[in-house]
Amino acid sequence: MNVAICGYGAGNVRSVEIAFGRLGAELTTDVVGANLAVLPGVGSARAAMEGLRERGHDVALRERFDDGRPIFGICLGLQLGLDWTEEDGGVDGLGLVPGRSSRLLEGRVPRMGWAQVDDRGAFYFAHSYAAETPHATAWSEGVVAEARFGSFFGCQFHPEKSGALGAVYLEEALSLSRV
């Protein structure tokens, strides 16, 4: 099983690489040909989209999506998969999942720490913006925690920082790419 982590010059690439490596995944730079492409989180939406475009990852991810090949977005990666985010004055996303991302209006911002995701257990969150999409599949404290549409699936939390439960979640992501 090989995994391509779509770096964009920022983000949590190394921790995601380590987490998938612990599960036995082999890392590759071939975004189109990998069993699973991962869009990691952390950073600014505008800088992330610019970095994806500079590296050609936006085109490679669109090709994967159109071919029905799995893409997994983590935190900002989930938000970048949407049509648009209001972050940085408004930024077009990859347009893989209908929806948008908006600044959190309630509670402490940024939202950082452990929070329950439906009945699955607690995962680690670190974000100031959240997805708004009709394709949500899990929630945490009124915020979309997971969304799936076509071959794209993503989570707002950080499974790579969520201990044993996060490792189980990443294993599920790998298993979806085996189908």
What are the residue ranges of the model-derived segments?
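Alpha-helical elements of the RecA-like P-loop NTPase motor core of helicases
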Residues: R14, R46, E50, A164
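Structural motif
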Residues: V38-P40, G154
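N-terminal beta1-alpha1 ligand-phosphate binding loop
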Residues: V3-L23, E160
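Structural signature of beta-strand start/N-cap positions in the alpha/beta core
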Residues: L36, P70-F72, A122
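Short acidic low-complexity segments
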Residues: A25-A34
